[in-house]
Amino acid sequence: MPRGLELLIAQTILQGFDAQYGRFLEVTSGAQQRFEQADWHAVQQAMKSRIHLYDHHVGLVVEQLRCITDGKSTDADFLLRVKEHYTRLLPDYPRFEIAESFFNSVYCRLFDHRSLTPERLFIFSSQPERRFRTIPRPLAKDFFPDHGWEPLLMRILSDLPLCLPWQNKSRDIRYIIAHLTETLGEDALPRCHVQVANELFYRNKAAWLVGKLTTPDGTLPFLLPIHRTDEGELFVDTCLTTTAEASIVFGFARSYFMVYAPLPAALVEWLREILPGKTTAELYMAIGCQKHAKTESYREYLCYLAESDEKFIEAPGIRGMVMLVFTLPGFDRVFKIIKDKFAPQKEMSAAHVRACYQLVKEHDRVGRMADTQEFENFVLDKRQIDPALMALLRQEAPEKITDLGEHIVIRHLYIERRMVPLNIWLEQVEGQQLRDAIEEYGNAIRQLAAANIFPGDMLFKNFGVTRHGRVVFYDYDEICYMTEVNFRDIPPARYPEDELASEPWYSVSPGDVFPEEFRHWLCADPRIGPLFEEMHADLFRADYWRALQTRIKEGHVEDVYAYRRRQRFSVRYETDRRPDKAFAPPSGNVRRA
């Protein structure tokens, strides 16, 4: 290879990333218009297209590099020089951290995920940690209650870039002040002030105002979800001021926010204070930089591994028929491998399973489906693998594993947030905790269905409980769109003997689902059955599911709330306006999405 080509290749990769992130910002900048026009289907399409942008631009750069090198092979020294030149381009580059991830992606695409070493890749960043600790330009604006909280909030809401009229701005301000007074106390409120992010955070059918509430006792989140009525008027739906509430809003089971972030590292640094429990990976994930979040997630894994002497073990819970799941005892994530052969009742291919996981990545997860990161050629030290797990890997997924002596390479796996399996949780709790879990499970099913997702296998073992007590679906191999399912009532038995027969007396076609059958496996536990019948009996009726299908086919997009229904201003304080459709969830049982 001629000298000087290394710099050209480095510049080509960085220019390719520039093009990708430019398109990323372009799609993101359309969020306000989509919100104001209530173009909810365009919101969903923009979410999918933005996810695809990264891989598309990696592919474009790879083709450019193949043209530049004329298809000639490159040696190790040449690749090291390319990385050196690329590293020299980054100190003054505003998105250096994601540019490093983009370089990694291009390398992996070129070399089919082989020879993934720190010398060739940015396994760890080449730049100082948290380089934007001092933000180069303001990301937020401060507001002080010099003349009271009412004019302060009026300034905040009036400064928003939204062009729609307000339904009743003064009323919403009263509600916010009422909430702050209840939360902080009337005496403390005059000594507090707010810092508000310059950009709104868009997701689903809401525009979120994200801020920091500085109190005498510390800094709290200040989150206002802004919705629009069917008539095109704005209103504030609630005010959230606890770190637990903010953590759920920015949770791993939710779609990525659309927030205009030309300096993503600076925004992540700004968010840390109100989301202290979130890792760097989770913060990048929340603002839509999911590929760099994968890089950060891997770095967090390596750091944990370096400080731990734990061994990988099979994850607790009922062993899956499709996936082999393992973890480290103290680590908050699990590793999932598609088995080489599935149980006989699982009539599907590995390609189908991967397509299901991709569907979840691109779909609105409504707070009820865990996000995943996909890895290829994942290396594990055999000394850190429990012998029982090693035997299981060789038994269930030998075609996915390459033995390199001291290490094994797993050809493909997913990393996902670790949760307590719901079936285990239900065995351990009683009273109100049991009731809350059953309510959460039913709500998860409802909200997934309203988002056009049918879980397929609804057994408790396929759901997990998060640290906030939320129930989240995580087994995707039978997932499908609601519109693909034929929900049927079980026909009346012809003879008394029919109900005792081992085979059904009625025909069953592919895609047929009989909701009455859910009762058999969801209500078998005498502690659970009465609670289910009380709160979620309609899930056993085919007409409930068919009604949801009709709404979906008519183009209706349900509201998704990242908080409990009782926290909404319309429920807490509503006295001076008639209820409207914007405040009515599809079921009275829906609490939080």
From Swiss-Prot:
At which positions is ATP bound?
Answer: A315, P316, G317, I318, R319, G320, M321, K336
Q: Where in the cell is it found?
A: Cytoplasm
Principal localization? cytoplasm
* Chain coiled-coil ranges: none
Keywords on record? ATP-binding, Cytoplasm, Glyoxylate bypass, Hydrolase, Kinase, Nucleotide-binding, Protein phosphatase, Serine/threonine-protein kinase, Transferase, Tricarboxylic acid cycle
One term under GO cellular component: cytoplasm
Quote one Gene Ontology molecular function term.
AMP binding
What does UniProt list as catalytic? D371
Tell me the Gene Ontology biological-process terms attached to this UniProt entry. Answer: glucose metabolic process; glyoxylate cycle; tricarboxylic acid cycle
Q: What reaction does this enzyme carry out catalytically?
A: L-seryl-[isocitrate dehydrogenase] + ATP = O-phospho-L-seryl-[isocitrate dehydrogenase] + ADP + H(+)
Q: What is the E.C. number? A: 2.7.11.5, 3.1.3.-
Matching entries from PANTHER family are given as:
ISOCITRATE DEHYDROGENASE KINASE_PHOSPHATASE (PTHR39559:SF1), PTHR39559
What role does it play? Bifunctional enzyme which can phosphorylate or dephosphorylate isocitrate dehydrogenase (IDH) on a specific serine residue. This is a regulatory mechanism which enables bacteria to bypass the Krebs cycle via the glyoxylate shunt in response to the source of carbon. When bacteria are grown on glucose, IDH is fully active and unphosphorylated, but when grown on acetate or ethanol, the activity of IDH declines drastically concomitant with its phosphorylation.
Q: Which family does it belong to?
A: Belongs to the AceK family.
Give the NCBIfam families listed for this entry: PRK02946.1
Q: What is this protein called?
A: Isocitrate dehydrogenase kinase/phosphatase
Gene name, please? Answer: aceK
